Structure formats: C-alpha cells, structure tokens
Regions:
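Residue-level signature of catalytic and energy-coupling elements of molecular machines
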Residues: 47, 114, 174
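Phosphate/pyrophosphate-binding loops at sites that engage ATP/ADP/AMP, CoA/4′-phosphopantetheine
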Residues: 175-181
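Short glycine-rich, Thr/Ser-proximal phosphate-binding strand/loop in the N-terminal lobe
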Residues: 96-113, 118
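Nucleotide/phosphate-binding catalytic cleft detector across ATP-hydrolyzing
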Residues: 1-77, 97-98, 121, 134-160, ...
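A general structural motif
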Residues: 166-175
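Gly/Thr-rich phosphate-binding beta-strand-loop-beta motif of the actin/hexokinase/Hsp70
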Residues: 69-99, 114
Length: 181
C-alpha cells in the first residue's frame, strides 16, 4: 500500500490536502507499506472460516486514518489490530466510536507457543514462523522444515497446528468482542 504523507505545491510548504489549490508543480511525499501475501491469505482464510466475510487489509496507519473519517462511513464497522503484544478491537456505529477493547494477548504468543512445542529458542521459533508458517493446517502441504541453526527438521503440518491453534484463540477473542456489540 502507498500512503501520501504530505504535498507541496510549487516547492512550497508541505500541506495535508492539495485539493482546491493551484500551481504548476505538485510534489508528493509518501510511505510504502509491504506485506507478505501468503500471511494475509492465511489470516483471511481464518476469518472466512469463522464466518466473517468482506475482509480488507490495510496497514494500521491507513486503517486508523480511515477510522478517523468515520463520519463518511456508510456502514458500521470494526477495526481489528492484531498486534504483537495485544489485539485492539474498535467498533464504530453511526459515524461515531462506540466501543473499544484491548485483549492483552497478541501474535507474539505464536512465537512462544512454537518455542514450547518444539523446544526451540525464541529466534528459531520466530524464523520458522516467518519463513514457513501457515495459519491453516488443512491447506498446508506436509513437508520437512529445517530448524534454523540445527540439522533437525520438523513437519510443516505440526508447525501449522501450533500456529492455527493460537490464531483461532485470538480470533475467538475478537469474535466475542464483536458479539458484545
């Protein structure tokens, strides 16, 4: 995703919105956000498997910016931020913030679960998650995965089972908050 940070007309001062201004030269400062497509597809599959449809992914910055313009929102919506240390659920209704909850368990727990399940260091667990992790065991093709910095391997489906279990727990917390709404 590409997000504009500011604009300058005719090399002038940076402004937030150039609409309605005239000039010969428009400069745009922007920020580029990248995401792992396979990771997003896994997360989308988990949401859809839980019965949640119409899922769109944005960097947190864009999501919060969109949420701040809630007066133009045509429908009620929830903003879910799956963070490393916690999950934030923010609910908007009729253009206003209605409910906000913080769940004190985040996606970093996937690393600690992987450490415990396979007797790995934090670094090894994190590397395995980022290189080979899948959140849906049912679509995981089983293969041997090399454990970083060792000659040992583990089954990809075993890793997917650990990741899926924690992701389901995180999403259950989100769904509970949505049901309270």
């Amino acid at each position: 995703d590409i997000l504009p940070v500011g604009y300058a007309i005719d090399r002038g001062e940076m402004i937030a919105d150039p609409l309605g201004r005239s000039g010969r030269n428009l400069e745009v400062t922007y920020q580029v956000y990248l995401a792992d497509y396979d990771y997003l597809a896994d997360i989308q599959g988990l949401f859809e498997g839980s019965g949640i449809q119409e899922i769109e992914f944005y960097p947190a910055v864009r999501a919060y910016a969109e949420a701040l313009d809630v007066e133009r929102a045509e429908r009620d919506f929830a903003l879910v931020d799956l963070g490393a240390m916690g999950v934030n659920v923010v609910l908007f209704r009729d253009g206003m913030l209605e409910y906000e909850a913080h769940l004190p368990i985040g996606v970093r727990t996937i690393d600690t679960d992987t450490m415990a399940a396979f007797a790995l260091s934090f670094g090894q667990a994190r590397k395995l998650k980022h290189e080979y992790g899948q959140a849906l065991r049912s679509i995981c093709k089983n293969k041997k995965l090399p454990i970083p910095d060792t000659r040992l391997t583990l089954e990809s489906r075993d890793l997917a089972t650990v990741i899926q279990s924690r992701c389901e727990e995180l999403l259950e917390g989100v769904i509970f908050q949505l049901q309270q709404w």
